[in-house]
Swiss-Prot record:
One of its GO terms (cellular component) is extracellular space. This is Complement C3. GO terms for molecular function: C5L2 anaphylatoxin chemotactic receptor binding; endopeptidase inhibitor activity. The gene is C3. The record marks R753, S754, R964, E965, V992, A993, R1308, S1309, R1325, S1326 as: Cleavage. Keywords: Cleavage on pair of basic residues, Complement alternate pathway, Complement pathway, Disulfide bond, Glycoprotein, Immunity, Inflammatory response, Innate immunity, Phosphoprotein, Secreted, Signal, Thioester bond. Glycans are attached at N944, N1620. In absence of complement activation, the C3 precursor is first processed by the removal of 4 Arg residues, forming two chains, beta and alpha, linked by a disulfide bond. It comes from Cavia porcellus. The keyword Phosphoprotein applies.
């Protein structure tokens, strides 16, 4: 906690002294910032008085003092030592609502007939708002639950009106609500549904009290597409810094734990890098693969790798930069991956830093000086147990847990500044590397140079509530004055408020007085102690002597709040973990009457984002930031002590008072040093290392068989052990090319059909876990039970959700007496020793094959489990699970291990679809099931297409004040079929003042500050930009942005230009490029113009300026008013649009007139008839204006006339008509002239106060992005900034935005209406419709707005991009007969994988993630050979540590970008399964995890793709069995019964005309000869229809052209749109050959033919029975 970080508890000890009677003094003390709607204490004192003294305190408005805002009375008596307090409260009123200026009040205290008055600053902050969201991260389409806690400045609940907005990551508010917390006990529960189509990134909830709109409180949350991880990764360096001299390098520990507490086994990829500001340098050589065993791994960044990776590679060049380390951990099963990062590890020469932030800046000579040093690690965290010592005085101390050490030194009796140097004395670090820092303390200044001092001290740095400390008052005074000081007065101030006032007596001769002070929770988070005494000193004048000290109090809640499990007898839950769905008891302990907001959050949420949790320390940080005290104590004199402590003091003695406080913020607060190092996501890459082997090994490996059948020469390219090894390898390889080494493996895989004789739970008895919320328990509970030991307890029974995880139960309470409290999170771990973790991606694309993995965990200590696992059928997916056939496998899981079971799916339906996997253990009656939803999205790419953008300005663009717009429907010709589109209609107001602020950013003007030089013309070219830039920055108050110190530099340059220009002044006061050249009218007028503007900035001699004015009038103005040019300038480019010969007399006369008008105020007294001569020029311009044609001339002359108030009537109309599109005065192909002319026109419009015409002109000027530069830019630069500065000054804060907008959508019966108002001008209002339709808009009212219409839809992509930056080919061939296979293997195949990286250099450290087909396992001997031969093709391989090797991960050191990298190995089938599920191969680069490619493989399906039928863009699964094979004999009744089953849609007699056979599916074109039962397709007899079947059903169907068939099927088998519907022949289709007429003569067909005739007759006549 830092001294000035928040409303600290200001404990002010005011020491005051009773004096001999005779010189009464009255004083008033208030906080120097008073807060609206808050009770504030005012301290009143009287000295040397008798009798009772009535006091009235009133608070008035400032400066008028018309209203009494608060008034209180009290009486000071001898019984209270003439010390008293009153409580005042300033109500919120309209005076305090305006945005302009600081808010002040007058506090008056009338002590009898003596009146004191003090002006005090008012803060509109009347309390705090704390916002808690249920989570820190959300997916699109989910709901944000949030609570707003409304509290006053004492953190107690308050009922007030608040405004809440929700802002996009771009800072645009899209929702704004006005809400009241009255009758809500200070807790507002709210929610917001995130749209499906939403911007990803950091969103904000912002809230403020209606009466203090500047005090905005906010909470952030992230929106992204994510899936919760199953484990967390912590990256912990052994030191928080990297010490540059450390030869050991940087050691980092990696900890990986499942969310349910078990340790992770896997592989971590680690890369280090150097961060220098925003730039990151990745250290490629540091890329390492680390095995994570039992949850931990270690990695070291060596000093050499660090130095080799940077340029220049010198240690000192790295100091000041920082290191980061990125870690990605992948489970052995390949099913999940988590990234973590530790950044900001500083590279330092000293491991510590010393700060004096908590040390006062002033000392009292000859009294102890308390030095509080904060020692931090380089990352800013406190460094405990570090010895520190002062230089010179050699005082030693040790830092405490908070990093603070206290050193007390004796100061000399001198009034000179005191230099204090402190350094660390940590063992093992050379002196040169110890941290050292020096501060300078200044002496406290006494009044009248007396020797009266007061010094306060406390024993410790961080104080704990519940203890009592002694506050020491050390007195030093003139010996003959000491006896006058009889007592001290003290007061305690909390969070900017005065809490308590009292007195502490003092006996004569006591140099030290001790005040015992109990530290209560009310003093959290920090407080100040201020003391003062007063006396008539040796100078016979009244003196005040003061001191203060700041103290930190350990953070905790003021009240109590604890959440714990509560099933044991003592209220403690003894169980370490719980089962899913189990009931458990929660106990909440807190203050009676408190309301507790609860939420349970899956810990996985905080793995992804832990940044935005509400904690008690965050609450205190907010409170600290509002502290009105500003230093760690003391002050430069008595007034400085009060002011720095946040107090205002006024006495009845002249001059005895504090100065007026300048602003609400402290000049430089001593910040509370709290910092957490956050983990961020980072991607990285890895390059492998290889250790040398002897040549014999090279030869042996050369003789080994190569699975890829590469030639010896190609294999040798993979040998990286030097020339000698390559030579040996080639020699032996060539000699023994035919050598074969047979490898056998003896491992069995337990995948088989369910054994009926073993005990196992049937699938239908397993109830799947399906409730996996990321947060729940979002309730508010009231603690009503009577208190026991001051604490109330509530017991709740809750049912846990289905997730296997750890839940963090978070609680925030709000109590009327104890305020807000955030409890420590209570963790509840949920798991079982056998379970399924079904890992699903965030979303999948319809019709695109995907692999998911169900990971089965067995946490039993010693038992292997034989498990039957089943994927359940869902018609929304194509998989090996069909309506007719289950997809089960049997796997064995070893103790404390896991097995990943892959499933290949093709999603067929858009939306949220369920995937369900169940598993049962043989002989144990243990089972688990998981049902999760998978989001299926359309093919194609989501596109945001802008349909229309319109400016809304009914007064300007409408007719009769109403603007009508017709918006067309979007062109969605490229939309993916069977997908939705959404049209978003967005409305936003454009407040005019907002446009002004956005005019030109100060940052853009840096190039304008230049040094003028050259001749009389060049000097003015150089002087112009600086003068106009300073003028602009002054007017727009942007110097803070530009750099305050730069203003003086710019003024010096202007002065220089002015002085240089005087060298070119001719004896007649005119100017030319050189003294011997003819005087120039234009240049002289321009000097007048620039000097007139500069006269506000530097000292300009009026005689110089006005002499030039006289010359222009007397020498260059003709009788008719026109000015003539007899000495043209050399640099014609500098004169802008006046340069053109056309209408030059009018434009030159206007230019001179404008210059004279701008000099008028300075020269009116020195130049006779100046006004008359200006008017004469105006007469000339006015007489010529009707004939002028050039827009430039009309603009400059228009401004000249406006200056004389003569731009009106027909002249004004001509001026306005010259504007192109009402926003610019355009000169063809002359951008600079157009900018200059439009600037003159804007100045004219501002003089006319035509604020409606102004905005489009300003907008056009802003859109030009013209910041003044380049050849010929002098006039454009000068005028654009003069005009924009004038605009900033003139455009009043006229809040003219009040517009009603109505949208009439054809699909809606009534219009949607919106009102755009100033107060919420930037609020983005939106309307959305799923219909793609044109609509009409009407707008009426004042001001401007913008309408944007955007269509969001899925557009077809030009071609399918399945792979990103990788090419991948996978082949599967039967192994040759010569290959020996293990005895148990049913068959052996060779899996070939070839891949190439499509980037411009090799992809280092890439990964092949291979799912094996059901029943197959890889040949480990082949894999060993690939990994361990001297010709290494792979870096390493990993398989599940269990009996089912169904996931294989291969690590490659690189994937070439210039040629294919190929590998192949044998895979053996150890048992047969009915349907083999395809396997998959996925390649990805470690540097960029988004770069990936997946291909499938299968022994029968060439590309490993599941069978599906597609019609246009709609696909359906064809993996199910073909239609039912009919029994040989079927009766009439059976036929009728089957045809009348529910769902049968049609019954036809058909004739097959022709067959169209293809590689995927067959189409049969049939004639519908008779409609026996009509269905959804209203087909007539004689029409043709297509019947579609998958190729694999061709043989089973065996249809013949020209033959007749009886066919019926389900409505779900109809496809396409009327009138051209197609029919699927699937498992539910009836296909029966109908014998031809001649075939019916045969005896074997007679009965069938008769039955078919009767069947047809019954169906047609009677239909189906009900």
């Amino acid at each position: 906690m830092g001294p000035a970080a928040g409303p600290s508890l200001l404990l002010l000890l005011l020491a005051s002294v009773s004096l001999a009677l005779g010189d009464p003094m009255y004083s008033i003390i208030t906080p120097n910032i008073l807060r609206l709607e808050n009770e504030e204490t005012v301290v009143l004192e009287a000295h040397e008085v008798q009798g009772d003294i009535p006091v009235t305190v009133t608070v008035h408005d400032f400066p008028a003092k018309k209203n009494v805002l608060s008034s209180e009375k009290t009486v000071l008596t001898s019984a209270t030592g003439y010390l008293g307090t009153v409580t005042i409260k300033i109500p919120a009123s309209k005076e305090f609502k305006s945005d302009k200026g600081r808010k002040l009040v007058v506090v008056q205290a009338a002590f009898g007939g003596t009146q004191l008055e003090k002006v005090v600053l008012v803060s509109l902050q009347s309390g705090y708002l704390f916002i808690q969201t249920d989570k820190t991260i959300y997916t699109p389409g989910s709901t944000v639950l949030y609570r707003i806690f409304t509290v006053d400045s004492d953190l107690l609940p308050v009922g007030r009106t608040i405004i809440v907005t929700i802002e996009t990551p771009d800072g645009i508010p899209i929702k704004r609500d006005t809400l009241s917390s009255n009758n809500q006990h200070g807790i507002l529960p709210l929610s917001w549904n995130i749209p499906e189509l939403v911007n990803m990134g950091q969103w904000k909830i912002q809230a403020f009290y209606e009466n203090s709109p500047k005090q905005v409180f906010s909470a952030e949350f992230e929106v992204k597409e994510y899936v919760l991880p199953s484990f967390e990764v912590l990256v912990e360096p052994t030191e928080k810094f990297y010490y540059i001299d450390d030869p050991k390098g940087l050691e980092v520990n990696i900890i990986a734990r499942f969310l349910y507490g078990k340790n992770v086994d896997g592989t971590a990829f680690v890369i280090f890098g150097v961060q220098d500001g925003d730039q990151r340098i990745s250290l490629a050589q540091s890329l390492t693969r680390v095995v994570i065993e039992d949850g931990s791994g270690e990695v070291v960044l060596s000093r050499q790798v660090l130095l080799d990776g940077v340029q220049p590679s010198r240690p000192e060049a790295l100091v000041g930069k920082s290191l980061y380390v990125s870690v990605t951990v992948i489970l052995h099963s390949g099913s999940d991956m988590v990234e973590a990062e530790r950044s900001g590890i500083p590279i330092v020469t000293s491991p510590y830093q010393i700060h004096f932030t908590k040390t006062p800046k002033y000392f009292k000579p000859a009294m102890p000086f308390e030095i509080m040093v904060l020692v931090t690690n380089p990352d800013g965290s406190p460094a405990p147990h570090v010895p520190v010592v002062t230089q010179g005085s050699n005082v030693q101390s040790l830092t405490q847990a908070d990093g603070v050490a206290r050193l007390s030194i004796n100061t000399p009796n001198t009034r000179q500044p005191l230099s204090v140097t402190v350094q660390t004395k940590k063992g093992g670090i050379p002196d040169a590397r110890q941290a050292i820092n020096t501060m300078q303390a200044l002496p406290y200044t006494t009044m009248y140079n007396s020797n009266n001092y007061l010094h306060l001290s406390m024993p410790r740095t961080e104080l704990k509530p519940g203890e009592t400390i002694n506050v020491n008052f050390h007195l030093r005074s003139d010996p003959n004055q000491e006896a006058k000081i009889r007592y001290y007065t003290y007061l305690i101030m909390n969070k900017g408020k005065l809490l308590k006032v009292g007195r502490q007596p003092r006996e004569p001769g006591q140099a030290l007085v001790v005040l015992p002070m109990p530290i209560t929770k009310e003093l959290i988070p920090s407080f100040r102690l201020v003391a003062y005494y007063t006396l008539i000193g040796a100078s016979a004048q009244r003196e005040v002597v003061a001191d203060s000290v700041w103290a930190d109090v350990r953070d905790s809640c003021v009240g109590t709040l604890v959440v714990k499990g509560g099933s044991g007898k003592d209220g403690q839950d003894k169980r370490q973990q719980h089962l899913p769905r189990q009931q458990m008891t929660l106990r909440i302990e807190g203050n009676q009457g408190a309301r507790v907001g609860l939420v349970a959050v899956d810990k996985g949420v905080f793995v992804l984002n832990k940044k935005h949790k509400l904690t008690q320390s965050k609450i205190w940080d907010v409170v600290e930031k509002a502290d009105i005290g500003c230093t760690p104590g003391s002050g430069k004199d008595y007034a400085g002590v009060f002011t720095d402590a946040g107090l205002s003091f006024k006495s009845s003695k002249a001059g005895l008072q504090t100065a007026q406080r300048e602003g609400l913020d402290c000049p430089k607060p001593a910040a509370r040093r709290r910092r957490s190092v956050q983990l961020m996501e980072r991607r990285m890459d890895k390059a492998g290392k290889y250790k040398s082997k002897e040549l014999r090994r090279c030869c042996e490996d050369g003789m080994r068989e190569n699975p890829m059948q590469f030639s010896c020469q190609r294999r040798a390219r993979y040998v990286s052990l030097g020339e000698a090894c390559v030579k040996a390898f080639l020699d032996c390889c060539t000699y023994m090319a035919q050598l074969r080494q047979q490898h056998r493996r003896e491992q069995n895989l337990g995948l088989a059909r369910s054994d009926m004789d073993e005990d196992i739970i049937p699938e239908e008895d397993i109830i799947s876990r399906s409730q996996f919320p990321e947060s729940w328990l979002w309730t508010i509970e009231e603690l009503k039970e009577p208190e026991r030991n001051g604490i109330s307890t509530k017991t709740m029974n809750i049912f846990l959700k289905d997730s296997i995880t750890t839940w963090e139960i978070l609680a925030v309470s709000l109590s009327d007496k104890k305020g807000i409290c955030v409890a420590d999170p209570f963790e509840v771990t949920v798991m079982q020793d056998f379970f399924i973790d079904l890992r699903l991606p965030y979303s999948v694309v319809r019709n695109e094959q995907v692999e998911i993995r169900a990971v089965l965990y067995n946490y039993r200590e010693a038992q292997s489990l034989k498990v039957r696992v089943e994927l359940l059928h869902n018609p929304a997916f194509c998989s090996l699970a069909t309506a007719k056939k289950r997809h089960t496998q049997t796997v064995t899981i070893g103790p404390k291990s896991s097995v990943a079971v892959p499933y290949v799916l093709v999603p067929l339906k858009i939306g949220l679809q369920e995937v369900e996997v169940k598993a049962a253990v043989y002989n144990y009656f243990i089972s688990d099931g998981v049902k999760k939803t998978l989001k299926v999205v359309p093919e194609g790419m989501r596109v945001n297409k802008t349909v229309a953008i319109r400016t809304l300005n009914p007064e300007q663009l409408g007719q009769g004040g109403v603007q009508r717009e017709e918006i067309p429907a979007a062109d969605l010709s490229d939309q993916v079929p069977d997908t939705d589109s959404e049209t978003k209609i967005l409305l936003q107001g454009t407040p005019v003042a907002q446009m002004a602020e956005d005019a030109v950013d100060a940052e853009r003007l840096k190039h304008l500050i230049i040094t003028p030089s050259g001749c009389g013309e060049q000097n003015m070219i150089g002087m112009t930009p600086t003068v106009i830039a300073v003028h602009y920055l002054d007017q727009t108050e942007q110097w803070e942005k530009f750099g305050l110190e730069k203003r003086q530099e710019a003024l010096n340059l202007i002065n220089r230009g002015y002085t240089q220009q005087l060298a070119f002044k001719q004896p007649n006061w005119a100017y030319a490029a050189f003294k011997n050249r003819a005087s120039s009218t234009w240049l002289t007028a321009y000097v007048v113009k620039v000097f007139s503007l500069a006269a506000n900035l530097i000292g300009i001699d009026s005689e110089v300026l006005c002499g030039a004015v006289k010359w222009l009038i007397l020498e260059k103005q003709k009788p008719d008013g026109v000015f003539q040019e007899d000495g043209p300038v050399i640099h014609q480019e500098m004169i802008g649009g006046v340069r053109t010969a056309q209408e030059a007399d009018v434009s030159l006369t206007a230019f001179v007139l404008i210059a004279l008008q701008e000099a008028k105020d300075i020269c009116r007294a020195q130049v006779n008839n100046l006004e008359a001569n200006i008017n004469k020029a105006g007469d000339y311009i006015e007489s010529r204006y009707a004939d002028v044609r050039r827009p430039y001339t009309l603009a400059i002359a228009g401004y000249a006339l406006a200056l004389l108030e003569r731009l009106n009537g027909a002249t004004l109309q001509k001026f306005l008509n010259a504007a192109t599109e009402k926003n610019r005065w355009e000169e063809a192909r002359q951008k600079l002239y157009s900018v200059e002319a439009t600037s003159y026109a804007l100045l004219a419009l501002l003089l006319l106060k035509d604020f409606d015409a102004v905005p489009p002109v300003v907008r056009w000027l802003n859109e030009q992005r013209y910041y003044g530069r380049g050849y010929g830019s002098t006039q454009a630069t000068f005028m654009v900034f003069q005009a924009l500065a004038q605009y900033q000054t003139d455009v009043p804060d006229h809040k003219d935005l009040n517009m009603e907008v109505a949208l009439q959508l054809p699909s809606r019966s009534s219009p949607s209406k919106f009102r755009l108002v100033w107060e919420a001008g930037s609020l983005l209002r939106s309307e959305a419709t799923k219909q793609n339709e044109g609509f009409k808009l009407t707008a009426k009212g004042k001001g401007q707005g913008t309408l944007s219409v955007v269509a969001v839809y899925y557009a077809k992509t030009k071609r399918k991009v399945v792979c990103k930056n990788f090419d991948l080919r996978v082949t599967l061939k039967p192994a040759p007969d010569t290959v020996k296979k293990p005895q148990e293997a049913k068959s052996t195949m060779i899996l070939g994988i070839c891949t190439r990286y499509l980037g411009d250099q090799d992809a280092t450290m890439s990964i092949l993630d291979i799912s094996m087909m059901t029943g197959f396992i890889p040949d480990t001997d082949d894999l060993k050979l690939l990994a361990t031969g001297v010709d290494r093709y792979i870096s390493k391989y990993e398989m599940n540590k269990d009996f089912s090797k169904n996931t294989l991960i291969i690590y490659l050191d690189k994937v070439s970008h210039s040629e294919e990298e190929c590998l192949s190995f044998k895979i053996h089938q150890f048992f047969n399964v009915g349907l083999i599920q395809p396997g998959s191969v996925k390649v990805y680069s470690y540097y960029n995890l988004d770069e990936t490619c997946t291909q499938f493989y299968h022994p029968e399906k060439e590309d490993g793709m599941l069978n599906k039928l597609c019609h246009k863009d709609l696909c359906r699964c064809a993996e199910e069995n073909c239609f039912i094979q009919l029994p040989e004999k079927i009766t009439l009744d059976e036929r009728l019964e089957k045809a009348c089953e529910p769902g049968v849609d049609y019954v036809y007699k058909t004739k097959l005309l022709k067959m169209e056979l293809s590689d995927d599916f067959d189409e049969y074109i049939m004639t519908i000869e008779q409609v026996i039962k009509s269905g959804s397709d209203e087909v007539q007899a004689g029409k043709e229809r297509r019947f579609i079947s998958h190729i694999k059903c061709r043989d089973a169907l065996h249809l013949k052209e020209g033959k007749h068939y009886l066919m019926w099927g389900l409505s779900s088998d109809l496809w396409g749109e009327r009138p051209n519907m197609s029919y699927i022949i699937g498992k539910d289709t009836w296909v029966e050959a109908w014998p031809e007429a001649e075939e019916c003569q045969d005896e074997e067909n007679q009965q069938q033919c008769q039955d078919l005739g009767t069947f047809t007759e019954n169906m047609v006549v009677f239909g189906c029975p009900n």
